[in-house]
């Protein structure tokens, strides 16, 4: 365990640029970095109890010795000279495609009941073994035969020491989701959409500083894997980072994550306040720095919803930025238009709030229906569905959401300018179709076949790669016309104006 150094300091807090007032006692706790966890300085007000984290120092990383043969596994291992963590290397032939092996008794597993399984990961880049504290994950997806899993990795079967990893550009983490993508036989729609969001966010002015430190600019991050359960093929999955405080680099007491669970209730469509009756209600507190004492976060969300409902157009345009990251909201609306994710106008909208700011930042989650997949996965959606419309200066976002209707009506010029900049830059038709081809080509065909044999479901007439590229090529000109009128966009166009 890392040593903590605590001292009491008297710090003068400057309340304005012109005056310095009120001094309060601050307890300062310095936590040095370890092999897998960042160091930081924790400031706690003795009077108010409010804590903040500053001066973060990256984890040092393991300092491994030489690889040694391990008679127990038949492979080899190397041990960190600092913390004693042992990294294993299998003697099995290494697959060019990542494989996850789970072994153990899964009887009784559910969303609330966990089981401990042996876990092994194999790829060309890395291999390791440990234990996985495993549950089912999701809401509606629990009804499908192919389940999502939340896995928490530990060094020991007693789950007393976290097994934190740093691979695939990720920080040291131990919580992951094995996403089944039951409706999406391509297994890549969610990943492609997340990459698009990350590209948009990276090109956004004034991105919140902590999002710059995340692996994917606030989007879910992952990659395809083949999963074997007790030595039998269990399915083609995505191994994603878990949606929590670590994903969003939240370290302070008054940080929070909200997620919309459904597109049906008026609360997630910003027509009425959030009620928070239970975890299956419209809005869910996915994370709160103050734990179950989260009423303040619920109140902050309802302040945003109330503003959207009650403000005049003049107030909405002038003051929205006090409640919601406007640039992020503009990108979110453009994103769901580009990808055709009409359901994500409400459901799976994620809102982030960091301590020191009252502004909610929108980000994306669960995008396996991107590029024209119907909600049940049994059909494809036409490219001309879910487009904004304008009639005599009055815009309809066609999202059935008061937030997006009002944003499109009151920030029309900013949305159109940002859209054109993206379409003539990182979101050209060629760039998007190439993403699709590359993502599908990375998965060996035999795993697609094995997944369909394991989970027989509707075989659509058009193959996923062909359908997605056709959808993009057909939809984008329609969206260009809907948002920009007769201004034709061609690959290679450029635009200098910023939004």
For the regions a language model picked out, list residue spans one by one.
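Short, solvent-exposed loop/turn and secondary-structure capping segments
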Residues: 162-165, 189-191, 237-239, 246-253, ...
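Internal "kinase-insert"/substrate-recognition segments embedded within catalytic cores
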Residues: 157-159, 164-166, 171-183, 204, ...
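Thrombospondin type-1
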Residues: 20-90
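Conserved NTP-binding catalytic cores of kinases and kinase-like/nucleotidyltransferase enzymes
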Residues: 82-84, 89-195, 499
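Structural recognition of the beta-strand scaffold that forms the well-ordered cores
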Residues: 149-152, 175-180, 187, 225-228, ...
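Gram-positive cell-envelope targeting signals
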Residues: 1-24, 62, 83, 499
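Middle-to-C-terminal accessory/interaction subdomains
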Residues: 130, 140, 144-145, 295-345, ...
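A conserved helix-loop-beta module that forms one wall/lid of the active-site cleft
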Residues: 185-226
């Amino acid at each position: 365990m890392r040593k903590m150094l605590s001292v009491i300091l008297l710090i003068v807090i400057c309340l304005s640029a012109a005056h310095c007032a009120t001094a309060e006692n601050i307890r300062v706790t310095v936590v040095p970095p370890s092999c897998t966890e960042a160091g930081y300085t924790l400031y706690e007000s003795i009077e108010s109890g409010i804590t903040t984290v500053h001066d973060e120092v990256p984890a040092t990383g393991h300092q491994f010795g030489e690889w040694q043969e391990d008679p127990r596994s038949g492979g080899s291992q190397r041990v960190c000279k600092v913390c004693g963590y042992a990294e294993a290397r299998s003697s099995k032939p290494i697959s060019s495609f990542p494989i996850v092996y789970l072994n153990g008794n899964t009887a009784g597993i559910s969303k609330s009941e966990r089981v401990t399984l042996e876990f092994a990961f194999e790829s060309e880049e890395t291999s390791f073994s440990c234990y996985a504290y495993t549950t089912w994950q999701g809401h509606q997806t629990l009804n499908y035969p192919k389940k999502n899993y939340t896995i928490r990795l530990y060094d020991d079967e007693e789950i007393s020491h976290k097994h934190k990893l740093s691979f695939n550009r990720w920080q040291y983490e131990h919580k992951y989701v094995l996403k089944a993508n039951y409706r999406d036989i391509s297994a890549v729609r969610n990943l492609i959409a997340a990459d698009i969001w990350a590209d948009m966010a990276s090109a956004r002015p004034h991105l919140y500083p902590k999002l710059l430190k995340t692996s994917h600019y606030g989007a879910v991050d992952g990659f395809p894997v083949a999963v074997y359960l007790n030595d039998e093929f269990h399915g083609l999955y995505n191994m994603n980072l878990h949606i929590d405080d670590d994903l969003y680099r939240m370290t302070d007491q008054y940080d929070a994550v909200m997620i919309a669970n459904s597109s049906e209730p008026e609360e997630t469509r910003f027509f009425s306040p959030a009620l928070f009756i239970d975890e299956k209600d419209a809005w869910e507190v996915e994370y709160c720095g103050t734990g179950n004492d989260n009423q303040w976060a619920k109140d902050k969300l309802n302040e945003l919803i109330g503003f959207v409902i009650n403000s005049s157009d003049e107030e909405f345009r002038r003051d929205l930025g006090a409640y919601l990251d406007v640039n992020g909201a503009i990108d979110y609306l453009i994103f769901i238009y580009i990808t055709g994710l009409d359901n994500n106008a409400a459901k799976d909208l994620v809102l982030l709030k960091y301590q020191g700011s009252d502004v909610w930042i929108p980000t994306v989650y669960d995008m396996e229906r991107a590029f024209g997949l119907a909600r049940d996965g049994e059909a494809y959606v036409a490219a001309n569905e879910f487009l904004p419309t304008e009639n005599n200066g009055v815009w309809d976002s066609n999202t059935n959401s008061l937030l997006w209707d009002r944003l499109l009506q009151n920030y029309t010029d900013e949305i159109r300018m940002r859209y054109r900049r993206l379409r003539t830059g990182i979101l050209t038709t060629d760039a998007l179709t190439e993403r699709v081809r590359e993502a599908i080509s990375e998965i060996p065909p035999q795993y697609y076949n094995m997944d369909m044999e394991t989970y027989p479901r509707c075989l659509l007439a058009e193959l996923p790669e062909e359908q997605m590229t056709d959808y993009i090529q057909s939809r984008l000109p329609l969206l260009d016309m809907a948002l920009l009128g007769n201004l034709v966009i061609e690959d290679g166009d450029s635009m200098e104006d910023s939004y």
